[in-house]
Amino acid sequence: RETMENLLLTIDPGTVDWSRAQFALTAIYHWLFVPLTLGLAVIMGIMETCYYRTRKEFWRSAAQFWQRLFGINFAMGVATGIILEFEFGTNWSNYSWFVGDIFGAPLAIEGILAFFMESTFVAIMFFGWSKVSAGFHLASTWLTGLGATLSAWWILVANAWMQYPIGCTFNPETMRNEMTSFFDVALSPFAIDKFTHTVTSAWVLGAAFTVGVSCWYLLRKRHVELAKQSIKIGSIVGLVASLLAASTGHESAYMVAQTQPMKLAAMEALYEGGNSQSLTGIAMVNPFSQPDYMNESEPPMRVAVPNMLSILATKSTTGYVPGVRDIIKGYTKADGTKEPSLKEKQERGKRAIQALKDYRAGKDKETNKKILDSDMKYFGYGYIKDANQLVPYIPINFWAFRTMVGLGCLFILVFALMLFILYRKDITRPRWLQYLGLALIPLAYIASESGWLVAEFGRQPWTIQDMLPTWAAVSDLSSGGIAFTFFLFLVLFTAMLTVEISIMCKQIKKGPAL
C-alpha cells in the first residue's frame, strides 16, 4: 500500500455510510447484552455469597435463578461480539492495516485471557453446584464476573486508544503505526476513565434489571420474598453504582475536554467558548438540522447551571472552555500553549502526506522522516476539506448526553426511594412504585445506549483521533454489498434479540425453584 490516496479517489460515499451503519447496528445490538452480563455478575455473586455464609436454601435458589438469566444473556453477547470483531477486517481493512499492530493487541489478550477465563468458570458455575465444594463454586461465580469485566477492560482499552492514541509511532517503511509502549496503551488515563464509567453504568443496568423483574413479581404477588431481597440487593448495588457512575462520568468529561474538545463542544452545542461557562440543562437545539457551524447562532431558550461546564472541563469555576468556532480558529489553552487552527492543522497534515509520498519514493528520506515525526499527529487533517466536516452531529450529541445524565439522576432517586420504602414501609403495597421499578429496565437501556451515542458520534469524523478520518478507514467494497449484509444482520440480530427476550420471559415467568 503506497498511501490512502487511491482509495479516497475511488471510494463510494455510500460505502462509508453503509459501513458505519452496519458497524453501529452490530455495536448497538451487542451492547444490549454486555452491560446486563456485567451487572448480573455482581448480583448473582452477592446472592451466592449470602448462600455460602448462611447455607440457606433460599439464597441458593435465588442465585441459581439470576444465573440462568445471566447465562442466556451471556450466550447472545458472545455471538454478537464475534461478528463485531470480524467487521474490522471486512469493512474497515484500511483501518486494520494502518493500526492493526496496536489495536489487535488488546483484542488478542481479551480473547486469549479474559474470554477463556470466563468461559471456563461459567461452565463450573452452571454445572458444578453438586460437583465442587461451595467455596470453589462461589469463587467460580465471582471469577466468571471478573473474566467478563476483564473482557470489557481490554475492549475498552482498544476503543480508548482510538480516541486518545498514545504509546505508538508511525513507521513509513511499513506504512503502519507500531506500538512503542504497551503500558501507555493499556493504562492510558482515557482508558481508565472509560472503563470505570462504562462498568459502573453496567452495574446500574444490572441493578435496574434486577429491581424491575422483582417489581413484576410484586405486581403479580408471586415470589414475594425473592422480590423483596432482590430489590434490596439491586437497590443497594444500583445506588452505589449510580453514584460511582456520576463520579466517573465527571472524570470522563474532564478527559474529553482535554483530548477531544470538539466532542465536548458538540455535547453542549457550544459555538462560542469563554471563561466561567454554564452547563446547559435544556435548549432549543433542532434535532433535524446540520447547520453551517461557522455562522450558526447559539441555541435559544437555554436553561443552564452557572459555571458548571467550566467545572466539568477544567475543574475550575473560571476555566476556559472552547466552542466549535474557537476550535476551528485556534485558541489558547489553560496552560498557555496555543492550539493550532484547523487551517494550520490541514497544512501540516498535507505536508505529512506529501512527505510520506516522497519518503516512499526514495526522495531525501532523512528530511521527509523529520517532517513525518513533526507533523504526523496532524496526518488526518490532510484529508479534511471543510470546517463543517470537523464537527460531529450536534443534535444527537446534545440530546443523547442530556438523556444519559437525566436518567442517571433519576436512577439515584429511584434506588434511594426503593431502599427507603423497603426499610421504613411495606414495599409490596405501593403499586406506583412497582410500576416505576419495572420502568427502570427500558430506561437503563436507553441511558446506556445514549452514553455510547455520545462517545461514538462525538468523535466523528475520526476513526482514530486526528490521525485517520472515517472515510479513509473503510474497505474498498461495493455499497450494495454492504447494504445487503446490513439488512441481513438486522434480520439476524432482531431474531436473536426476539429469541433472547422470549427465553428470558419464560424463565422469569417460571421463577426460581423455591
Question: Where do the language-model regions lie?
Answer:
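C-terminal substrate/ligand-recognition segments
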Residues: 389-452, 483-507
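Membrane-interface interhelical loops and short amphipathic "cap" helices
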Residues: 4-28, 55-62, 86-108, 160-196, ...
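Membrane-interface helix-loop-helix modules in multi-pass inner-membrane proteins
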Residues: 73-143, 160, 457-461
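Hydrophobic alpha-helical transmembrane segments
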Residues: 34-43, 113-121, 202-213, 403-419, ...
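Membrane-interfacial loop-to-helix junctions in multi-pass inner-membrane proteins
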Residues: 54-72, 98-104, 108, 128-146, ...
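Aromatic-rich transmembrane-lumenal/periplasmic boundary elements in polytopic membrane proteins
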Residues: 158, 240-347
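Hydrophobic alpha-helical membrane-insertion segments
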Residues: 71-80, 142-165, 238-249, 359, ...
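Internal alpha-helical transmembrane segments
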Residues: 123-131, 136-142, 153-162, 182, ...
